Swiss-Prot record:
A molecular function (GO) term: oxidoreductase activity
Species: Arabidopsis thaliana
Any Pfam family the entry gives: adh_short_C2
Keywords for the protein's UniProt record, in alphabetical order: NADP, Oxidoreductase
Protein residues bound to substrate: 146
Protein name stated in the entry: Tropinone reductase homolog At2g30670
Active site: 159
TM region positions: none
Similarity comment text for this entry: Belongs to the short-chain dehydrogenases/reductases (SDR) family. SDR65C subfamily.
EC number(s) reported in the record: 1.1.1.-
Amino acid sequence: MDKRWSLQGMTALVTGGASGIGHAIVEELAGLGARIYVCDISETLLNQSLSEWEKKGFQVSGSICDVSSHSERETLMQTVSKMFDGKLNILVNNVGVVNPKPTIEYVAADFSFSISTNLESAYHLSQLSHPLLKASEFGSIIFISSVGGVVSMECGSIYSLTKGALNQLAKTLACEWARDGIRANSVAPNFIYTAMAQPFFKDADYEKSLVSRTPLGRAGEPNEVSSLVAFLCLPAASYITGQTICVDGGLTVNGFSYKPQA
C-alpha cells in the first residue's frame, strides 16, 4: 500500500471514543493501522468497545477520564506519553456536550460546564500534547466542531460559542505550530445519528425541518464524519491545515431555493 494512505506505525489519542462519532473515528484510524488510546467518561461503554476492538484485532487501549477535569487531563496525557514513548501523531478532540435552551435561561453552571467540557478540554489537551506531537515529526490535531459553530443552529448559544471557538483555535494552532510539524484542522458535522443527537430526532417536526434544509435530504451517519477525520490524519493530507470542513450534506451552503410542487 502507498504509505500516503496508511497510518501504520502511527499513534493516536481519541477523547470520547467509546460511542457515537468518536467510536467511528477509532474504528477508522485503527483500520488504517494506527495504535490508539481512547478515553471516555463511561466505564461501561469503554469496556464494551475495548472488547469489541480486541476481537477485531485493533490495537486500542484506554481508560476512564472526565475531560472537564484539569487534573484528569494531565493524568491522561502522562499515561499516553508513557504508552507511546513520548510521541503522538494524532490528537482527536472529540468530546462535547450540548444543552439546548434559550440564552436567557442559561445559568453560570451551564456556561462553566459547557466551556470546560467542549472548549477548555480541547485547548488544554492540545497544549499538553504539543511536545508529543512535535516529537513524532508528523503531528495532526483534529477538533470535532459542529455546523453550529459556522452558522446559527438551534443547539444553544453556549454550544455554538464553544464550537466556533474550536474552529478559530484550529486556525491559530495551524499557523503557530506549523514550524513544529503539527497540522490542525476542524471538522464540523451536521446533526449525525448518535445517542447525543437522539433528543433532536425525537421531535419529528424538527427532523423534518432539518432535512428540508439539507440538500442531500437526510442527517448523517458517524462513519461519514470519521472518514474525513481519518483522511486529514493521513500523509496524503500533509498540505491541509487550518481548515474548518463541514460534513453536513450541504446545509451550510444552502441558500433559498423554491421548488414548486409538480
